[in-house]
């Protein structure tokens, strides 16, 4: 494992073999690749945390684009290379697309985040020239008990203050964390997964439906909408990812016969909430 804090990683992951790496600062320690057949590259500055100041946007771009470039450069220097590179991307690649069905071959948007995704994935795909199969995992809104989007949503909903964002018509390409892991492993093991793969549930919902379902799961009312201008005032440019409508669908995963553990939203939320000690 490579990360910013290898000591913490070893403690948290049971003594895993961990190495220090700052993604945007240069090559990786080559000893980390010894005997490895698959590389999972998941590192990067969090996109949905904090306002997108100039410094934040620079950190997002450099950690992903430069980090991936540094990774591929290190792979090029190896005498024996891994066979597969799986790189995390995000559904922000597609931008705000209304009710359009979004598959892996849909065109990118021209927003800041989409442009980062295009550059990020392009750097990853250069590993094909080194003989690696490359999968870029465009990940949606992750539902997990202790990470992803859900824990940040819960406090107002628990108080009965939850509500839809704007008019609630925007599509949310959600995914349970167990299926994120499952799809990353599926990408690593499946030769037919080559290029982009949407890491999303086969059943996206609108924000209105999501809000209602989460309220029902918590047995709380969820009727206080958050206006678009309020999100813009609170989060600035970053609010675009909260309001973007992305009806992304997992065509590649389904065509390669991935079996979703949580294809429906309510069981996914119940599974997360059952592990939440504060519920």
Regions found by a protein language model. Give the residues of each.
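Conserved Rossmann-fold NAD(P)-dependent oxidoreductase catalytic core, especially the SDR/UDP-sugar
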Residues: 57-59, 69-111
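Glycine/proline-rich active-site loop of Rossmann-fold NAD(P)-dependent oxidoreductases
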Residues: 118, 130-132, 143-152, 187-197
